[in-house]
Amino acid sequence: MAKIPYAILEKGSLLLASPDTDQGVFARSVILLCEHSLNGSFGLILNKTLGLEISDDIFTFDKVSNNNIRFCMGGPLQANQMMLLHSCSEISEQTLEICPSVYLGGDLSFLQEIAASESGPTINLCFGYSGWQAGQLEKEFLEGNWFLAPASYEYVFSDNPDNLWSRILKDLGGKYASLSTVPENLLLN
């Protein structure tokens, strides 16, 4: 797997929390960077799933046929806001391509339509987001709080999000692979 140098801190990168980041929701988090500019950055956490059921408040029909829907905590900011990460390229006017085959956006009617389809695309319903002010993410990166990896469909819609942090570090190889085995509780080491 190709390494991403610091100069490519951009949309479509994955941020992996360093093993010594123990700041609640960001501990061992994998964040898809959805926007990065001089004004700031925002992303969605991929590996903190929520144990939610499909809600009647969201869907106006009786049967949800798409089994590829997952609820995620996108981050600690505006936790009542829902964002859609999905693999459907058919509504390009409503979505932003983050990396190949991964899109952000869509409205409630789009969500209901794809939820009703057995062959519907993979969807992460993300509640909240992670955000950084101008220069903040760069500073955190230079301090060693984050590692970078390229985003891909396979990572964003991983079948095992709980293991995603370790998997990506192993895939990066070298020193990153050895970090993937560091226990969450260093007292157990």
Curated annotation (Swiss-Prot):
One cellular-component annotation, GO: cytosol
InterPro entries: AlgH-like
Pfam family, one: DUF179
HAMAP family xref list: UPF0301
Family of the protein in this entry: Belongs to the UPF0301 (AlgH) family.
Record's protein name: UPF0301 protein CCA_00630
Lineage: Bacteria, Pseudomonadati, Chlamydiota, Chlamydiia, Chlamydiales
